[in-house]
Regions:
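Extended recognition/assembly regions associated with phosphoester-bond processing machinery
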Residues: 1-45, 50-389
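Conserved small/polar residues in nucleotide/adenosyl-binding loops
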Residues: 390-395
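Extended, polar beta-sheet/loop recognition surfaces of beta-rich domains
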Residues: 398
């Protein structure tokens, strides 16, 4: 059996203030083209279809186009979808019975009653049956009715749901899951585009994945194995943060042969409309580095000029049309970072601003600039004193209290 492993489409996502819907429509079209070429039996999508629980009409339309294009392929392709933590389980489940008749298998919610089990989809090839278990994002509160005792951790919740299943380990079994898996305490490599919970409470140990010949995982945005080679995060199809600059995005294609053999894994490169790039250097260097193949990319720019550049933002925007951020890294900015929080809090507001101005501009303020700052600071003090006078108790109030 051959299948594509996708996850974390995050359709409708914005990168800083840029709408990425055009890039997402483009990359999904390229995935369809790869499916037409490689002819997988199935496409597994391991959660976070959308970026928000209530996606826009445009985002829903883009995913509809993707499913329709996959459904039109010959030979037929089955699509298996689970909900991730960004998705609304009920919205993902909408029309799932009708869609199943068109080879689109959806699981929005994990089992929540004792009668329910994980949704299973079966395939048959020359080596026998392949069982695909569709396990959506699980929280302890979702599955608390499955047993009489308490379930307090994500690890307990996922383990409970999987161990209830009657999994035939003589067959080839695949799990599609969207959780934060760790291997003997080792966490996967993350990026800035992911939402993490404090204290590791979302961690699920990969030991629970042992019954499966392949675990198609979602939730982590960088492609990687976690523990065994069979446990894989495929990563996002696009770069969704500056921290992912330089990451090569791919479609994970997996072939399962006879039971007991390792899966054959191939990473099919994806070429985005726009890459995320980091550019570091003097203003003139970055302006001169502009070329037809990068001026439309998403760029994070760090300027290292020691002498203050004139209107750097305006100049850069004339060359690069998708600037994510402009930062300054030079001797002056590094000195500012050397101030401790206690030192900053102990400074008089006027003295603090004078120090800041001199460090940023390499000169003292002019008389006019000094007068403006003194007026602003004195005005703030007067407002604060008025507020204090207005809210303080009068002597009469104190005498009667």
């Amino acid at each position: 059996m051959k299948f594509f492993h996708l996850s974390d489409l995050h359709i409708g996502k914005q990168l800083h203030h840029y709408n990425m819907i055009a890039e997402q429509r483009d990359i999904l079209g390229k995935i369809v083209a790869l499916a037409e070429r490689e002819k997988p039996d199935a496409v597994l999508i391991a959660g976070d279809i959308y970026d928000t629980p209530v996606p826009s009409a445009e985002a829903v339309s883009v995913f509809d186009e993707f499913l329709t294009a996959l459904n039109d392929l010959e030979p037929e392709v089955t699509v298996c979808i689970i909900a991730g933590n960004h998705d609304s389980a009920k919205r993902i489940d909408f029309a799932s019975d009708i869609l199943a008749k068109h080879r689109v298998m959806i699981a929005g919610m994990p089992p929540v009653t004792r009668e329910e089990t994980i949704r299973k989809v079966s395939f048959f090839d020359a080596y026998g049956e392949v069982c695909i278990y569709l396990l959506p994002f699980v929280k302890p509160s979702y599955v608390r009715n499955l047993i009489d005792g308490d379930i307090t951790t994500y690890d307990e919740a996922v383990r409970l749901v999987i161990e209830r299943e009657n999994i035939d380990t003589a067959k080839r079994n695949i799990l599609v899951s969207h959780q934060f898996y760790t291997a003997a305490g080792r966490e996967p490599e993350t990026s800035d585009s992911e939402i993490r919970m404090v204290g590791g409470i979302e961690n699920v140990d990969t030991a629970v994945l042992e019954p499966f010949d392949y675990a198609a995982l979602g939730h982590i945005h960088r492609k990687q194995k976690i523990g065994r080679v069979q446990n894989r995060y495929c990563g996002t199809p696009l770069q969704y943060s500056v921290s992912e600059a330089g990451d090569e995005k791919t479609v994970t294609m997996v072939e399962l042969l006879e039971k007991g053999s390792e899966p054959h894994i191939t990473e099919l490169p994806l070429m985005p409309m726009r890459r995320v790039r980091k550019m570091i250097g003097h203003l003139d260097e970055i302006l001169n580095a502009a070329a037809e193949d990068n001026c439309h990319d998403y760029v994070s720019i760090t300027l290292t000029d020691e002498v203050e550049a004139y209107q750097p933002k305006e100049k850069l925007e004339q060359v690069y049309d998708h600037i994510l951020e402009i930062k300054i890294d030079n001797e002056r900015t590094r000195k500012i970072l050397e101030f401790s929080e206690e030192e900053v809090e102990s400074l008089d507001p006027y003295d603090a601003f004078v120090t800041f101005f001199q460090e940023m501009n390499g000169r003292a303020m002019t008389e006019d600039e000094d007068n403006v700052i003194r007026t602003v600071i004195n005005g703030e003090k007067e407002v604060a004193e008025c507020c204090l006078l207005y809210t303080s108790p009068s002597p009469r109030d104190l005498s009667t209290s």
